[in-house]
Amino acid sequence: MKKENLVSVPFMVLGIVFCVCLVAANLLETKVVQLGPVAVTAGLIVFPVSYIINDCIAEVWGFRKARLIIWMGFLMNFFVVALGQLAIAIPAAPFWQGEEAFDFVFGMAPRIAAASLTAFLVGSFINAYVMSRMKVASQGRHFSARAILSTVAGESADSLIFFPLAFGGLMPVNELVKMMVVQVVLKTAYEVVILPVTIRVVNYIKRVDDSDVYDEHISYNVLKIKEI
C-alpha cells in the first residue's frame, strides 16, 4: 500500500478538529455580534480555523486528503442539522421553559445550514485547489503567501455565497455587503495572525509524518472521494 494512502494520527486529529469547528461555526452563525462599528456573525470565532486546517492538510497530504476531509465536514454538519430538526419535531416536556430559545437556534439552522454548507463546499474546495496548484507551481516555496492567497480566494467565494443565501431579505443590502467584506478581511487577518503557528505545525507534521505531497497528475474532480 502506498504511504499517501495511509491515515496517520496527525491527519485524524486535524480532521476531527476540522469537523468540530464546522459544526460549531454552523450553530454560531445564527447570532450576529457587534465588533466596534461593524457587525459580524459569531461564527467568525471559530470558522477561520477550518481554513487554516484545510491549508495544513492540503500542504502536507495534498488535495486528495483535503477533499476527503471537506466531504466529511459536510456530512457531519448535515448530520447535526438533521438531528436538530428531529429534536424540534419531538414534543417538549410541559414543564420545560427553553423551547422557544432552542427552536430559535435550531429552527434557523436549516436556512443557515443550507447557505453554510453550499458556501463551505465551494470555498473550501477553492482554498484547497489554489493551495495545491500554487505549491506545485512554486515547487513548495512561499508557504505563507500561498496560505494567505488561498484563504482570500476561498473566503471570498464563501462569503459571496453564504451571506445572500443566509441573510438575504433579513437586513438592508448595504449592511449585507458590509458584513461580507468585513468577514473576508477579518478571516484573512485571522489567518495572518495565526500564520507563525501554522508554519510551525506544518513543518512539525511534515517531519513527524514524513509526508510532503505534491499534487502532480491528479484529478481535481471534487466527487472522486475514493481517490485518497
Give the location of each predicted region:
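Alpha-helical transmembrane segments and their lipid-water interface positions
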Residues: E29, V33, V80-I88, G123, ...
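Short aromatic-rich membrane-water interface segments that cap or initiate transmembrane helices
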Residues: T41, I45, A101-A115, V182-Q183
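Membrane-interface interhelical connector segments
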Residues: L86-A109
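Internal alpha-helical transmembrane segments of multi-pass membrane proteins
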Residues: A137-S156
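Pore-lining and gate-forming transmembrane alpha-helices of multi-pass membrane transport proteins
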Residues: S150, K178-E191
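Interfacial helix-loop-helix junctions of multi-pass membrane proteins
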Residues: P164-N174
